[in-house]
A protein has these predicted regions:
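Active-site beta-loop-alpha junctions enriched in small/polar residues
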Residues: 13-19, 46-48, 81-84, 122, ...
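N-terminal pre-domain/capping segments
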Residues: 1-115, 133-136, 169, 198-199
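Active-site groove signature of glycoside hydrolases
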Residues: 105-128, 143-146, 170
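Secondary-structure boundary/capping motif
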Residues: 23, 54, 127, 152-153
Length: 200
């Protein structure tokens, strides 16, 4: 067997299997097995989607998780978080509650052996700043996902970059999504939007 001419490692976000998981044609274990079979050794888990009883993470799930990692030759790399700011019908979460939610998700990542937490794009910069010291303490990186229609000169991303540069926190960064490189929507997406009543 020849040695590859690069050191790029392949991983997969289990978000890629969301339809199969939702339709129950694949279990979490199946998703990990398939990832391993195609040579994607790094695994990103979406806890809200794939951990039964989330935000509670049972000892049984953790044991199964590490058993699957060993069995299929995969490694936990990242978890994803969604900041549920509208948890209550009459108000948004306060800054303190949002940071506490991040702490919970950081703890879940640590428990599952992941060193990266991918934060959803709508995460306010002040929440990332507030959670950074805890992430540093736990040895976790908080990376803001960047995908279309956002780009690296978008005002929202610039606000995040200001926090990253000002604090100098090694826990904060950006995670590019391939959608960053989208120049236009695929024709089928535009046509469907028009059929559904969108105005050009």
């Amino acid at each position: 067997m020849t040695t590859p001419s690069h050191a790029i490692k392949r991983g997969v976000s289990l978000y890629s299997f969301q339809e199969e998981y939702f339709l129950r044609t694949l279990s979490v274990e199946d998703c990990i097995r398939i990832a391993g079979e195609i040579g994607a050794r790094g695994i990103e888990l979406i806890p809200e989607q794939m951990i039964p009883g989330f935000p509670h993470v049972s000892d049984e799930f953790v044991a199964d998780w590490f058993s699957w990692m060993e069995q299929y030759g995969t490694t936990p790399v990242a978890t994803d978080l969604f900041l549920d700011t509208k948890r209550y019908p009459d108000r948004w979460l306060t800054l303190e509650e949002q940071v506490a939610s991040f702490h919970r998700d950081i703890d879940i990542a640590v428990r599952l052996g992941a060193t990266v937490v991918r934060a959803i794009i709508n995460t306010p910069p002040e929440v990332m700043e507030g959670a950074a010291p805890y992430a540093e303490e736990k040895g976790v990186r908080l990376l803001l996902e960047v995908h279309a229609p956002f780009h690296y000169e978008h005002p929202w991303i610039l606000q995040h970059l200001e926090v990253m540069h000002r604090t100098g926190s090694p826990a904060l960064g950006l995670m590019p999504d391939m959608g960053t490189f989208v120049e236009r929507f695929p024709r089928v997406v535009s046509e469907r939007a028009l059929r559904n009543g969108a105005k050009p």
